[in-house]
């Protein structure tokens, strides 16, 4: 969100992160999905909510998985949408898209909206409504523009364990 910035953490080297992920090497990230899960639990605690229905999309789906695994008594139900379990062999981005997404120039404030639209066009496929998404992307960029934060989030995802076996008990 808008409350904490990690400028001192620097910018992850995304090419190194991607290659390390491909070859199963350890990835050092400024923070982890478990850290973000702890933050989410902190919000529930501050609202005095002991147990909740959790829903998350994409990285949010991974975060709710971490909560369900590590704090099952806090979860009424869990819904993980457009996400995966951390198994590098399944549920990732299609290989044909990786070359189009990795190594692209970092967006500037001026190019951020169109870059976001293009990224989602590549992921969504032929039925993507660019104009509708452009409005959403503009709202996102107007709220907060921090490409380094996105890179740190991608590093957090890449550095996280495979949760497949652990999720079978949820």
Where are each of the predicted segments found?
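Gly/Ala-rich beta-loop-alpha elbow adjacent to hydrolase catalytic centers
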Residues: 56, 60, 64
């Amino acid at each position: 969100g808008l409350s904490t910035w990690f400028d001192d953490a620097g910018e992850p080297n995304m090419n190194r992160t991607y290659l390390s992920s491909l070859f199963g090497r350890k990835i050092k990230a400024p923070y982890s999905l478990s850290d973000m899960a702890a933050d989410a639990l902190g919000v529930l605690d501050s609202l005095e909510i002991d147990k909740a229905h959790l829903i998350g999309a994409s990285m949010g789906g991974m975060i709710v998985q971490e909560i369900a695994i590590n704090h099952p008594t806090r979860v009424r139900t869990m819904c993980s949408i457009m996400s995966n379990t951390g198994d590098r062999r399944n549920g990732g981005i299609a290989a044909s898209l990786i070359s189009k997404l990795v190594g692209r120039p970092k967006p500037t404030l001026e190019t951020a909206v169109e870059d976001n639209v293009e990224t989602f066009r590549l992921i969504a496929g032929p039925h993507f409504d660019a104009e509708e998404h452009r409005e959403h992307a503009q709202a996102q960029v107007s709220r907060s523009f921090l490409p380094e934060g996105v890179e740190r989030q991608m590093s957090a995802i890449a550095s996280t364990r495979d949760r497949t076996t652990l999720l079978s008990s949820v």
